[in-house]
C-alpha cells in the first residue's frame, strides 16, 4: 500500500497515512480477505474555510483534496463566523456567492455552512476519512484530528484573500 501512494507522488508521511487507512479498512470487516484497490481510496475528504475571494491557492487545495477520495465535502464559514474570525469588513463576498463559486469549480460534492468558529461539530456529524488543511497548520492543532486522518497541503505561494484585499485597499 505504501509503495502505491509513494509512486503517486505523495510525500512519504502522507503515503504512510493513506496506506494505514487502506489496511484499517481491510481489517475492520471480520474474516480474511485480500486488500483491493478500493481499500486504498478513502471515501470522504473534508476541508474547510472562508473561501471569500476564490483564488488559485484555493483551487490547488480543492484539486489536491479531490484526488484523495471519492467525495469532497467543504465546510464553509458563515458570514457571522467570518466576521468574528477575519474582522467586521469581512466577508467580502456573501455566503450565496461563495457557495456559487465553490460549486462552479466542479470539484466539491457537498458544501455545509457552519456558524461556529471551528468546524468541529460538523466534522463530528460527517465523520470524514481525511481532513485536509494548509501547511500553515500543525497536525496536532487541526480541528478534528482525533476524528479523522489529517493531511497538510503544502502551500507553494503565500496567496491569501486577506493579502489580496489589503493590496486592493492600498491602491
Residue locations for each model-derived region?
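Conserved post-catalytic alpha-helical subdomain immediately downstream of the catalytic base
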Residues: 1-36
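Nucleotidyltransferase catalytic core that binds NTPs
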Residues: 13, 37-171
